[in-house]
Regions:
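Alpha-helical transmembrane segments of multi-pass small-molecule/ion transporters
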Residues: 1-314
Length: 314
C-alpha cells in the first residue's frame, strides 16, 4: 500500500498538470499559437538544460559500474529494435516515429531518483541508469523522429544530409553532449550557476505538460486506440516482463534492480510529445500514450516493485 501511495503521489500530479493545460485552453487562457510557442520554448531551452543538469551533476568516475551501464545500454537498444519492428505492423504508418519513441522512452531520470531515494534514502545506482539510458533515449528519439517523419519519403542523399544535420544541431543532443563533457572534465558548479540552471530546468516538465494538455484533442489522441493500447502495454508491461527476469538472473538487486525496473516500466515521458511536435509530427498519438501510461503506471510500477520486494530482491 505504501508503494502504491508513493507511486500515486508521483504520477497523479503529472496527470493533473497535463489536464490543467487542457482546462486553460478550454477557458481561453491558452490558444493554439501560445501553446505552439510554449512547446518550441520547452524544446529549445528548458529541456536541453534539464538533461545537461541531470548528466553534468553525476560524478561518472565515482559512480561507474561497467556491468550495470552495459546491461542498461543493451536492453535499451534491444527495446528500441523491438519497437521499430513492431511499428512495421502499423497501417497507415504515419505514426511509426511516435509509436517507436513512446513505447521505449521512460520518465527514467526524474522518477528513478525519486523512487530510489524514497526506498533507500539516497540516489543509489540511479545516476548510472541515467548515464546508460537517457543519452541513448534522446539520441535514438532524434534519429527515429527524423527517419520516420510522415512526409519523409525515401532516404536519398538530400534527405539523409538534412536528417544528419537535424540530429547534430538538435538542442536535446547538444544538452547531452554539454552535460557529458562537464561531468567528464569535473568542472565545478558554482552556487549561482547551479541555482540559475536548476530554476530553468525545473520549468521543463510543468511547461511541457501544460503545453501537451493545451494541445490535447481527445478524439485525435485516441483515434488510433489499438496502437495506443499496444504502445502502452509494451511500455508498462512488455519490456518489463521480457527483461526483468534477465536482470535478476544477472545478479542485480536492491537499488540497481529498482533502477532497471524504473527504466523499463515507468510512464512515457512528456518529452515524447515535445520532441514529436517540434520535429514534424502531429504529436496527438504521443500525447495519448503519455496520458495512458501516466494513468496506469502507478499500478503497474507498484506491482513490479511489490513482486521484487516479495522475492527479497529489493
Amino acid at each position: 500500500m505504501d508503494n502504491l501511495i508513493f507511486c500515486l503521489n508521483v504520477t497523479v500530479p503529472i496527470f493533473l498538470t497535463l489536464l490543467l493545460g487542457y482546462f486553460f485552453r478550454r477557458i481561453g487562457l491558452f490558444d493554439e499559437a501560445f501553446v505552439n510557442r510554449m512547446n518550441k520554448f520547452v524544446f529549445v531551452i528548458p529541456l536541453p538544460v534539464l538533461l545537461f543538469q541531470d548528466i553534468a551533476k553525476i560524478d561518472i568516475y565515482e559512480a561507474w559500474d561497467s556491468k550495470m551501464v552495459i546491461f542498461c545500454f543493451l536492453i535499451t537498444s534491444v527495446s528500441i529494435i523491438i519497437s521499430v519492428l513492431l511499428s512495421r505492423l502499423l497501417h497507415p504508418s504515419d505514426i511509426r516515429g511516435e509509436f517507436i519513441q513512446a513505447s521505449y522512452r521512460s520518465s527514467a531520470a526524474i522518477l528513478g531518483i525519486a523512487v530510489i531515494q524514497n526506498l533507500y534514502g539516497n540516489a543509489g545506482m540511479a545516476p548510472l541508469m541515467i548515464i546508460a539510458s537517457v543519452p541513448l533515449y534522446n539520441v535514438m528519439a532524434v534519429v527515429v523522429l527524423s527517419v520516420f517523419k510522415p512526409d519523409q519519403g525515401r532516404l536519398d542523399g538530400t534527405v539523409l544530409k538534412r536528417t544528419l544535420k537535424g540530429i547534430v544541431t538538435n538542442p536535446i543532443i547538444l544538452g547531452i553532449v554539454a552535460g557529458t563533457l562537464w561531468s567528464l572534465l569535473r568542472l565545478p558548479f558554482p552556487k549561482i550557476l547551479d541555482s540559475t540552471v536548476g530554476n530553468l530546468a525545473k520549468t521543463a516538465t510543468p511547461l511541457g505538460l501544460m503545453a501537451m494538455g493545451g494541445s490535447l484533442h481527445f478524439w485525435k489522441a485516441f483515434s488510433r486506440l489499438k496502437a495506443s493500447v499496444a504502445c502502452t502495454f509494451m511500455k508498462l508491461i512488455g519490456y518489463e516482463a521480457l527483461f526483468l527476469p534477465l536482470a535478476i538472473r544477472c545478479g542485480f538487486t536492491k537499488d540497481k534492480l529498482v533502477s532497471i525496473i524504473i527504466m523499463l516500466g515507468s510512464a512515457s515521458t512528456v518529452t515524447c510529445f515535445v520532441m514529436a511536435k517540434n520535429m514534424g509530427h502531429e504529436g496527438s498519438f504521443s500525447s495519448g500514450v503519455v496520458l495512458l501510461t501516466t494513468l496506469f503506471s502507478a499500478f503497474t510500477l507498484t506491482l513490479w516493485l511489490f513482486i521484487c520486494k516479495g522475492l527479497g530482491l529489493i
